[in-house]
């Protein structure tokens, strides 16, 4: 993967997250902000999830209350380099825990 393809895939990921949160109709308040390639999701209780790009490694990093995760593109999915779980699974688990209700991005 070259840098431009990495940025295209990361942009696509950011856009999907932003669209899903714009459509959010749950009880809790969830905000999303993108600044300088860093996407921050803020929950009603003040907790945050931070997602950023690591261009030199062509990775996406996810920081949650539960820990930090690094994802590589494998096939057509972002996969955690430690657990093998998908980005969407780990993001949904963390967002659900931090929101106090089920959050889905798919």
Swiss-Prot record:
Q: Where are the transmembrane segments?
A: none
Gene Ontology BP annotations? iron-sulfur cluster assembly
Q: Which GO CC annotations does the UniProt entry carry?
A: cytosol
**Which superkingdom, per the lineage?**
Bacteria
Q: Which SMART domains does this one have?
A: Frataxin_Cyay
Entry keyword Iron: yes
Write down the SUPFAM superfamilies for this protein, in alphabetical order: Frataxin/Nqo15-like (SSF55387)
Which GO MF terms are attached to this record?
Answer: ferric iron binding; ferrous iron binding
Is Iron included in the keywords of this UniProt record? yes
Matching Pfam families, A to Z?
Answer: Frataxin_Cyay
Instruction: Give UniProt keywords alphabetically.
Output: Iron, Metal-binding
What task does this protein carry out? Involved in iron-sulfur (Fe-S) cluster assembly. May act as a regulator of Fe-S biogenesis.
Q: Which family does it belong to?
A: Belongs to the frataxin family.
Name this polypeptide is given: Iron-sulfur cluster assembly protein CyaY
The organism is: Escherichia coli (strain SMS-3-5 / SECEC)
């Amino acid at each position: 993967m070259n840098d431009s393809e990495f940025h295209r895939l990361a942009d696509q990921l950011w856009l999907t997250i932003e669209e899903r949160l714009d459509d959010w109709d749950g009880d809790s308040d969830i905000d999303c902000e993108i600044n300088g390639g860093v996407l921050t999701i803020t929950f009603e209780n003040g907790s945050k999830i931070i997602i950023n790009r690591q261009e030199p490694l062509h990775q996406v990093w996810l920081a949650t209350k539960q820990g930090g995760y690094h994802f590589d593109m494998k096939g057509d999915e972002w996969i955690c380099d430690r657990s093998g779980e998908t980005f969407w699974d780990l993001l949904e688990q963390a967002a659900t825990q931090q929101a106090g209700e089920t959050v889905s991005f798919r």
